[in-house]
């Protein structure tokens, strides 16, 4: 009863006004959809099918409003209470419309917003950059699951039979066009068709998944009829991928196509000339595609199969709608680019390797062609053949065999000699040759003779020629050169080398002898020093003892003996005191007590 009273309080004029507004809006949408078809073959039926997820929801909210408006009009004007018939009609009505009525009436304007603001700009303004001939195959697949939903069709909607007939006709036309285009492509692009047929089921699977997402969103919206505003947002998010996902494809398709064209142009392995049309995609389409991709990456996290979307469309059909069907079909077959792109770099590298191999083979052929010509003028002979001739000794930087030098550095030596020969007025080209020989395997020497038409060229002329190219000879491993007359000088030079070595050894030996002599002198000096130190040390001790104790140890006996000898004559001759030894007697007389003390000290010791 509370619900009935709450429904009766609504003003009777509000529901008719809302009905008029909703009907007018959808009639305008129908007229706009029928007058302005899509640029890529979109019909009014396809537009209506796309509008079903958003347009059916307000229609569900219209029927309860109609019944409520009629029921409210049946009440008595003056009594303020509904009549019995009005109450019976309200009781028979499903109860869910009573408590949903206020929210549906308040939120019906929210449902009109996305349909008017979101759907039509995407289909009219951005159709040039979004739609493609390959999308024309997808669009009939989108409305196929929609008639299965238990939804209330609007009064202006076409019956399903007519729609099915039109869809079947369109599909038949498209199939015929596709078959014609495939026949033409099979003649021109035989390697392309294999991957193209693999791309078709992916396109259809994507169309089925996108179409299955939209009815799922509408079903969940009807189940959660309490939150109409949130369901409107879900409608936008569910319709977003189905309409805007093709805009993501230019960013992923165009760079790969351009790279593949550049790589195929470098390798000169272009499989078909018809593909050149679709690769001319302007930067504006790619910029719009990047913007659309950035928007989708933030809005739709629920779609996990975005990396597979580039296999559905290509931007060439959107930018060039007036192209022949072959160009549009090649744009639809552009998903095979990733498969072919993996093969083109290898082909390009193979092409470059082939070119490099050809160049190397050409150089090797030229070198091989020169070797026989050089071998006739640069010859290795035995040492016995050069004995007694005016040969020149070439001192090499390394121990190299004659044959190895002839093969690797003989042409360079020949070229250097050819440059110098005209200056010295020697024979013409081909009238002379160079003979080389190695006297011993251990020495880094080669013997060279220059033989002309008149015989062996004198060594002085050869030396003058080699003097002009001395720096160039160092580059090919010839350190210096000498003549046969300087062979003895070379031996003496070796001897002089030994002499210098001997001199160095003698000098080093002399230095060692000097060092040894100095060592012996130092040892002798060290032996003399202890003796000198011992003597001086004894004298110092005696002096110290005499100075400290006044005790002349060695002189005591001598003094006492002298005093004893002096006393005897003094006793015998009494006048001896005045004689020359009187001073000793006086000193002895004075030292008597000291002498007794000394003897006492000696006894103590």
Curated annotation (Swiss-Prot):
Q: Where in the cell is it found?
A: Membrane
**GO BP terms in the entry:** leukocyte tethering or rolling
Q: Which GO terms describe its molecular function?
A: glycosaminoglycan binding
**Could you name the Gene Ontology cellular component terms for this entry?**
Golgi lumen; plasma membrane
UniProt modified residues of type Phosphoserine: 570, 596
Q: Where is this region: Disordered?
A: 129-347, 554-605
Return any one Pfam family short name: CD34_antigen
Q: What is this protein called?
A: Podocalyxin-like protein 2
Its lineage reads: Eukaryota, Metazoa, Chordata, Craniata, Vertebrata
């Amino acid at each position: 009863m509370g619900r009935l009273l709450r429904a009766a309080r609504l003003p009777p004029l509000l529901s008719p006004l809302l009905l008029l507004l909703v009907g007018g809006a959808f009639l305008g949408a129908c007229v706009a959809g029928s007058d302005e078809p899509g640029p890529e073959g979109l019909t009014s039926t396809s537009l209506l099918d796309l509008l079903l997820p958003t347009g059916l929801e307000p229609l569900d909210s219209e029927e309860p409003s109609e019944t409520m408006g009629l029921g409210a009009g049946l009440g008595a004007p003056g009594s303020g209470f509904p009549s019995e018939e009005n109450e019976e009609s309200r009781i028979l009505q499903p109860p869910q419309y009573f408590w949903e009525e206020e929210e549906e009436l308040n939120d019906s304007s929210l449902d009109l917003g996305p349909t008017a603001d979101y759907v039509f700009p995407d289909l009219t303004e951005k159709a040039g950059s979004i739609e493609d001939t390959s999308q024309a195959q997808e669009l009939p697949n989108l409305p196929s699951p929609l008639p299965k939903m238990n939804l209330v069709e609007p009064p202006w909607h076409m019956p399903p039979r007519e729609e099915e007939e039109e869809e079947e006709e369109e599909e038949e036309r498209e199939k015929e066009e596709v078959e014609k285009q495939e026949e033409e492509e099979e003649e021109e692009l035989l390697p392309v068709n294999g991957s193209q047929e693999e791309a078709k089921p992916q396109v259809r699977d994507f169309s089925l998944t996108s179409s299955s997402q939209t009815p799922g969103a509408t079903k969940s919206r009807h189940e959660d009829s309490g939150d109409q505003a949130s369901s409107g947002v879900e409608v936008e998010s569910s319709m977003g991928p189905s309409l805007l996902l093709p805009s993501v494809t230019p960013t992923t398709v165009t760079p790969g196509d351009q790279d593949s064209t550049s790589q195929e142009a470098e390798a000169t392995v272009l499989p078909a000339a018809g593909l050149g049309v679709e690769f001319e995609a302007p930067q504006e389409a790619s910029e719009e595609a990047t913007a659309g991709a950035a928007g989708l990456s933030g809005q739709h996290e629920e779609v996990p199969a975005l990396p597979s979307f580039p296999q559905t469309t290509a931007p060439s059909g959107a930018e060039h709608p007036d192209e022949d069907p072959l160009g549009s079909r090649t744009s639809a077959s552009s998903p095979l680019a990733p498969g072919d792109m993996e093969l083109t770099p290898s082909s390009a590298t193979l092409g470059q390797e082939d070119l490099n191999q050809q160049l190397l083979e050409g150089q090797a052929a030229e070198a091989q062609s020169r070797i026989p010509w050089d071998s006739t003028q640069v010859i290795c002979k035995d040492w016995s053949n050069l004995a007694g001739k005016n040969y020149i000794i070439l001192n090499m930087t390394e121990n190299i065999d004659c044959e190895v030098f002839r093969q690797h550095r003989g042409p360079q030596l020949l070229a250097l000699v050819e440059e110098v020969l005209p200056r010295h007025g020697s024979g013409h080209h081909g009238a002379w040759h160079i003979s080389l020989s190695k006297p011993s395997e251990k020495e880094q020497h080669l013997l060279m003779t220059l033989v002309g038409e008149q015989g062996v060229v004198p060594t002085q002329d050869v030396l003058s020629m080699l003097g002009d190219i001395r720096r160039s000879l160092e580059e090919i491993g010839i350190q210096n050169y000498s003549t046969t007359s300087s062979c003895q000088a070379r031996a003496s030079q070796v001897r002089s080398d030994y002499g210098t070595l001997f001199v160095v050894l003698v000098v080093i030996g002399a230095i060692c002898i000097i060092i040894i002599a100095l060592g012996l002198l130092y040892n002798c000096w060290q032996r003399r020093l202890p003796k000198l130190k011992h003597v001086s040390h004894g004298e110092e001790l005696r002096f110290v003892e005499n100075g400290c104790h006044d005790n002349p140890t060695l002189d005591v006996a001598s003094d006492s003996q002298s005093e004893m000898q002096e006393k005897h004559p003094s006793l015998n001759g009494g006048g001896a005191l005045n004689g020359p030894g009187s001073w000793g007697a006086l000193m002895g007389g004075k030292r008597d007590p000291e002498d007794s003390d000394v003897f006492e000290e000696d006894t103590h010791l």
